[in-house]
Protein backbone atom coordinates (compact mmCIF):
# COMPACT_ATOMS: atom_id res chain seq x y z
CA UNK A 1 0.00 0.00 0.00
CA UNK A 2 1.42 3.41 -0.98
CA UNK A 3 2.17 5.94 1.77
CA UNK A 4 -0.80 8.16 2.45
CA UNK A 5 -3.36 5.62 1.26
CA UNK A 6 -3.84 3.71 4.53
CA UNK A 7 -7.54 3.01 5.08
CA UNK A 8 -9.31 5.22 7.59
CA UNK A 9 -11.71 3.94 10.26
CA UNK A 10 -14.62 3.71 7.79
CA UNK A 11 -12.64 2.29 4.86
CA UNK A 12 -12.38 -1.39 3.95
CA UNK A 13 -9.51 -3.56 2.87
CA UNK A 14 -9.36 -5.29 -0.49
CA UNK A 15 -11.24 -8.37 0.74
CA UNK A 16 -14.15 -6.23 1.90
CA UNK A 17 -13.54 -6.58 5.64
CA UNK A 18 -13.84 -3.45 7.74
CA UNK A 19 -10.63 -2.33 9.37
CA UNK A 20 -9.89 -0.69 12.70
CA UNK A 21 -12.61 -0.33 15.39
CA UNK A 22 -15.39 -1.33 13.00
CA UNK A 23 -13.59 -4.58 12.20
CA UNK A 24 -13.12 -5.40 15.88
CA UNK A 25 -16.82 -4.88 16.53
CA UNK A 26 -17.83 -7.10 13.62
CA UNK A 27 -15.43 -9.80 14.76
CA UNK A 28 -16.89 -9.66 18.27
CA UNK A 29 -20.43 -9.94 16.91
CA UNK A 30 -19.48 -12.90 14.75
CA UNK A 31 -17.88 -14.58 17.75
CA UNK A 32 -21.06 -14.06 19.80
CA UNK A 33 -23.23 -15.59 17.09
CA UNK A 34 -20.84 -18.49 16.65
CA UNK A 35 -20.70 -19.11 20.40
CA UNK A 36 -24.48 -19.28 20.72
CA UNK A 37 -24.97 -21.39 17.62
CA UNK A 38 -22.48 -23.92 18.99
CA UNK A 39 -24.49 -24.07 22.22
CA UNK A 40 -27.75 -24.44 20.30
CA UNK A 41 -26.31 -27.25 18.19
CA UNK A 42 -25.16 -29.12 21.30
CA UNK A 43 -28.57 -28.71 22.94
CA UNK A 44 -30.54 -29.83 19.89
CA UNK A 45 -28.27 -32.83 19.33
CA UNK A 46 -29.11 -33.95 22.86
CA UNK A 47 -32.85 -33.17 22.81
CA UNK A 48 -34.24 -32.19 19.37
CA UNK A 49 -37.05 -30.08 20.87
CA UNK A 50 -34.48 -28.05 22.85
CA UNK A 51 -34.03 -25.78 19.85
CA UNK A 52 -32.63 -22.28 20.31
CA UNK A 53 -32.64 -19.04 18.38
CA UNK A 54 -31.23 -15.56 18.98
CA UNK A 55 -32.82 -12.16 19.48
CA UNK A 56 -30.94 -8.91 19.14
CA UNK A 57 -29.27 -7.50 22.24
CA UNK A 58 -31.66 -5.11 23.96
CA UNK A 59 -34.69 -6.57 22.20
CA UNK A 60 -37.56 -7.73 24.42
CA UNK A 61 -37.54 -11.50 24.89
CA UNK A 62 -41.03 -12.56 26.14
CA UNK A 63 -40.87 -15.29 28.76
CA UNK A 64 -43.57 -17.33 27.01
CA UNK A 65 -45.01 -16.99 23.52
CA UNK A 66 -47.55 -18.79 21.36
CA UNK A 67 -48.83 -18.53 17.80
CA UNK A 68 -51.85 -16.62 19.12
CA UNK A 69 -49.53 -13.74 20.16
CA UNK A 70 -51.24 -13.71 23.55
CA UNK A 71 -49.56 -12.10 26.55
CA UNK A 72 -47.21 -14.44 28.46
CA UNK A 73 -49.60 -14.73 31.43
CA UNK A 74 -52.40 -15.77 29.07
CA UNK A 75 -50.14 -18.37 27.50
CA UNK A 76 -49.38 -19.76 30.98
CA UNK A 77 -53.12 -20.01 31.64
CA UNK A 78 -53.56 -21.85 28.34
CA UNK A 79 -50.82 -24.30 29.34
CA UNK A 80 -52.55 -25.09 32.63
CA UNK A 81 -55.93 -25.27 30.90
CA UNK A 82 -54.61 -27.78 28.39
CA UNK A 83 -53.60 -30.28 31.07
CA UNK A 84 -56.81 -29.71 33.02
CA UNK A 85 -58.88 -30.53 29.94
CA UNK A 86 -56.66 -33.40 28.80
CA UNK A 87 -56.72 -35.16 32.18
CA UNK A 88 -59.59 -33.91 34.35
CA UNK A 89 -59.42 -37.12 36.39
CA UNK A 90 -55.86 -36.38 37.56
CA UNK A 91 -56.87 -33.40 39.71
CA UNK A 92 -55.59 -29.87 40.42
CA UNK A 93 -52.26 -30.90 41.96
CA UNK A 94 -51.34 -32.84 38.81
CA UNK A 95 -52.37 -30.01 36.48
CA UNK A 96 -50.19 -27.59 38.39
CA UNK A 97 -47.25 -29.99 38.70
CA UNK A 98 -47.33 -30.82 35.00
CA UNK A 99 -47.61 -27.16 33.99
CA UNK A 100 -44.70 -26.14 36.21
CA UNK A 101 -42.53 -28.96 34.93
CA UNK A 102 -43.27 -27.92 31.35
CA UNK A 103 -42.26 -24.34 32.07
CA UNK A 104 -38.93 -25.26 33.67
CA UNK A 105 -37.51 -28.28 31.86
CA UNK A 106 -35.77 -26.37 29.07
CA UNK A 107 -33.85 -24.04 31.36
CA UNK A 108 -32.58 -26.97 33.44
CA UNK A 109 -31.35 -29.05 30.52
CA UNK A 110 -29.91 -26.02 28.74
CA UNK A 111 -27.94 -25.19 31.89
CA UNK A 112 -26.51 -28.73 31.92
CA UNK A 113 -25.48 -28.49 28.26
CA UNK A 114 -24.01 -25.01 28.77
CA UNK A 115 -21.90 -25.87 31.81
CA UNK A 116 -20.78 -29.40 30.97
CA UNK A 117 -20.45 -29.38 27.19
CA UNK A 118 -20.03 -25.69 26.27
CA UNK A 119 -18.19 -24.58 29.45
CA UNK A 120 -20.10 -21.29 29.57
CA UNK A 121 -23.31 -19.77 30.93
CA UNK A 122 -25.65 -17.84 28.61
CA UNK A 123 -28.30 -15.33 29.66
CA UNK A 124 -30.62 -17.95 31.20
CA UNK A 125 -32.36 -15.21 33.17
CA UNK A 126 -33.57 -13.69 29.89
CA UNK A 127 -34.58 -16.90 28.20
CA UNK A 128 -37.83 -16.89 26.23
CA UNK A 129 -39.86 -20.02 25.48
CA UNK A 130 -42.40 -21.19 22.94
CA UNK A 131 -45.71 -22.93 23.65
CA UNK A 132 -48.06 -25.03 21.56
CA UNK A 133 -50.77 -27.55 22.48
CA UNK A 134 -49.68 -28.22 26.05
CA UNK A 135 -45.98 -28.43 25.28
CA UNK A 136 -43.26 -25.88 26.01
CA UNK A 137 -40.39 -26.23 23.56
CA UNK A 138 -38.00 -24.01 21.67
CA UNK A 139 -36.28 -21.06 23.29
CA UNK A 140 -34.66 -17.71 22.57
CA UNK A 141 -31.64 -16.02 24.09
CA UNK A 142 -30.30 -12.49 23.64
CA UNK A 143 -27.04 -11.96 21.78
CA UNK A 144 -24.89 -11.26 24.82
CA UNK A 145 -21.46 -12.53 25.91
CA UNK A 146 -21.55 -15.75 27.90
CA UNK A 147 -19.91 -16.17 31.29
CA UNK A 148 -16.68 -18.20 31.26
CA UNK A 149 -14.75 -19.68 34.16
CA UNK A 150 -14.06 -22.77 36.22
CA UNK A 151 -16.93 -25.18 36.70
CA UNK A 152 -17.66 -24.02 40.26
CA UNK A 153 -18.02 -20.45 39.00
CA UNK A 154 -20.26 -21.60 36.15
CA UNK A 155 -22.53 -23.56 38.49
CA UNK A 156 -22.88 -20.55 40.80
CA UNK A 157 -23.68 -18.13 37.99
CA UNK A 158 -26.00 -20.58 36.25
CA UNK A 159 -27.87 -21.02 39.53
CA UNK A 160 -28.28 -17.28 39.95
CA UNK A 161 -29.65 -16.91 36.45
CA UNK A 162 -31.93 -19.93 36.77
CA UNK A 163 -33.42 -18.49 39.96
CA UNK A 164 -34.25 -15.24 38.17
CA UNK A 165 -35.78 -17.16 35.25
CA UNK A 166 -37.88 -19.37 37.52
CA UNK A 167 -39.09 -16.38 39.53
CA UNK A 168 -40.48 -14.88 36.33
CA UNK A 169 -42.24 -18.14 35.47
CA UNK A 170 -43.60 -18.40 39.02
CA UNK A 171 -45.13 -14.95 38.63
CA UNK A 172 -46.65 -15.83 35.25
CA UNK A 173 -48.27 -19.09 36.33
CA UNK A 174 -49.23 -17.62 39.69
CA UNK A 175 -51.35 -14.94 38.01
CA UNK A 176 -53.94 -17.57 37.14
CA UNK A 177 -53.32 -20.32 39.71
CA UNK A 178 -52.70 -20.66 43.42
CA UNK A 179 -48.98 -21.28 43.49
CA UNK A 180 -46.65 -21.35 46.49
CA UNK A 181 -42.85 -21.43 46.70
CA UNK A 182 -43.15 -24.46 48.97
CA UNK A 183 -44.89 -26.30 46.14
CA UNK A 184 -42.46 -25.52 43.32
CA UNK A 185 -39.10 -25.65 45.10
CA UNK A 186 -39.17 -29.42 45.77
CA UNK A 187 -40.25 -30.01 42.17
CA UNK A 188 -37.36 -27.90 40.91
CA UNK A 189 -34.88 -29.72 43.14
CA UNK A 190 -36.11 -33.07 41.83
CA UNK A 191 -36.00 -31.98 38.20
CA UNK A 192 -32.55 -30.44 38.59
CA UNK A 193 -31.01 -33.54 40.17
CA UNK A 194 -32.81 -35.88 37.76
CA UNK A 195 -31.17 -33.96 34.90
CA UNK A 196 -27.76 -33.73 36.59
CA UNK A 197 -27.58 -37.48 37.22
CA UNK A 198 -27.93 -38.05 33.46
CA UNK A 199 -25.05 -35.75 32.49
CA UNK A 200 -22.43 -38.57 32.39
CA UNK A 201 -24.73 -40.44 29.99
CA UNK A 202 -25.06 -37.34 27.82
CA UNK A 203 -21.41 -36.30 27.88
CA UNK A 204 -18.83 -39.07 28.23
CA UNK A 205 -16.11 -36.66 29.35
CA UNK A 206 -18.00 -35.99 32.61
CA UNK A 207 -17.78 -38.69 35.29
CA UNK A 208 -20.41 -39.86 37.73
CA UNK A 209 -18.11 -38.87 40.61
CA UNK A 210 -17.91 -35.32 39.24
CA UNK A 211 -21.65 -34.77 39.12
CA UNK A 212 -22.02 -36.39 42.54
CA UNK A 213 -19.60 -33.79 43.92
CA UNK A 214 -21.40 -31.01 42.06
CA UNK A 215 -24.93 -31.93 43.18
CA UNK A 216 -24.94 -29.95 46.48
CA UNK A 217 -23.37 -26.96 44.73
CA UNK A 218 -26.13 -26.92 42.11
CA UNK A 219 -28.83 -27.04 44.79
CA UNK A 220 -27.17 -24.27 46.80
CA UNK A 221 -26.64 -22.09 43.72
CA UNK A 222 -30.30 -22.48 42.78
CA UNK A 223 -31.57 -21.87 46.32
CA UNK A 224 -33.12 -25.34 46.51
CA UNK A 225 -33.39 -27.73 49.49
CA UNK A 226 -30.28 -29.83 50.14
CA UNK A 227 -32.51 -32.49 51.70
CA UNK A 228 -33.17 -33.75 48.19
CA UNK A 229 -29.67 -35.23 48.14
CA UNK A 230 -31.29 -38.12 50.05
CA UNK A 231 -32.50 -39.36 46.67
CA UNK A 232 -29.04 -39.39 45.08
CA UNK A 233 -27.50 -42.84 44.62
CA UNK A 234 -23.76 -43.43 44.81
CA UNK A 235 -21.99 -43.91 41.49
CA UNK A 236 -20.88 -47.48 42.21
CA UNK A 237 -24.42 -48.79 42.67
CA UNK A 238 -26.30 -50.39 39.75
CA UNK A 239 -28.56 -48.11 37.74
CA UNK A 240 -31.73 -49.37 36.09
CA UNK A 241 -35.46 -48.82 36.49
CA UNK A 242 -35.41 -50.65 39.82
CA UNK A 243 -32.41 -48.63 41.04
CA UNK A 244 -32.39 -45.24 39.30
CA UNK A 245 -29.53 -42.81 39.75
CA UNK A 246 -31.84 -40.36 41.49
CA UNK A 247 -35.09 -41.06 43.33
CA UNK A 248 -37.48 -38.11 43.33
CA UNK A 249 -38.47 -36.77 46.73
CA UNK A 250 -41.80 -35.39 45.49
CA UNK A 251 -44.18 -37.41 43.32
CA UNK A 252 -44.98 -35.88 39.91
CA UNK A 253 -48.48 -37.45 40.14
CA UNK A 254 -48.35 -38.95 36.64
CA UNK A 255 -49.95 -42.09 38.08
CA UNK A 256 -53.19 -40.14 38.66
CA UNK A 257 -53.86 -39.98 34.91
CA UNK A 258 -56.11 -42.66 33.45
CA UNK A 259 -53.17 -43.72 31.29
CA UNK A 260 -50.59 -43.12 34.00
CA UNK A 261 -48.38 -45.28 36.17
CA UNK A 262 -45.64 -44.82 38.74
CA UNK A 263 -42.43 -43.47 37.23
CA UNK A 264 -39.23 -45.49 37.57
CA UNK A 265 -37.78 -42.94 40.00
CA UNK A 266 -41.03 -42.33 41.91
CA UNK A 267 -40.72 -42.16 45.71
CA UNK A 268 -43.82 -44.36 45.95
CA UNK A 269 -42.13 -47.10 43.95
CA UNK A 270 -38.93 -46.77 45.95
CA UNK A 271 -40.62 -46.40 49.33
CA UNK A 272 -38.79 -43.12 49.85
CA UNK A 273 -39.70 -39.65 51.10
CA UNK A 274 -42.82 -37.66 50.32
CA UNK A 275 -45.61 -37.87 47.81
CA UNK A 276 -47.40 -34.83 49.21
CA UNK A 277 -49.60 -33.03 46.72
CA UNK A 278 -49.72 -29.67 48.44
What are these regions (language model features)?
Residues 2, 11-50, 165-185, 189-204, ...:
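Non-catalytic accessory segments flanking enzymatic or RNA/DNA-binding domains
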Residues 2, 9-114:
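N-terminal, charged low-complexity regulatory/assembly segments
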Residues 213-278:
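Cys/His-clustered metal-coordination modules, chiefly Zn-binding fingers
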Residues 5-8, 12, 18-21, 52, ...:
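Hydrophobic transmembrane signal anchors and adjacent membrane-proximal interface regions, especially
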Residues 73-242:
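Hydrophobic, aromatic-lined core segments that form the binding pocket/scaffold
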Amino acid sequence: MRPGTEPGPLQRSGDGRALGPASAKEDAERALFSDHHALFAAAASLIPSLKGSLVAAGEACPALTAATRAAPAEVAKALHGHWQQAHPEAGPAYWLTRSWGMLCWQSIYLAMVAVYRHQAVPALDRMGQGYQAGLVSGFTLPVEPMIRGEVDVLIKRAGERLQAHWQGLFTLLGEGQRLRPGFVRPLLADDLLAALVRVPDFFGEVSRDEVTAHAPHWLAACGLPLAHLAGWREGGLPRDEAFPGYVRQRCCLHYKRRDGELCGNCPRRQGRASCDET
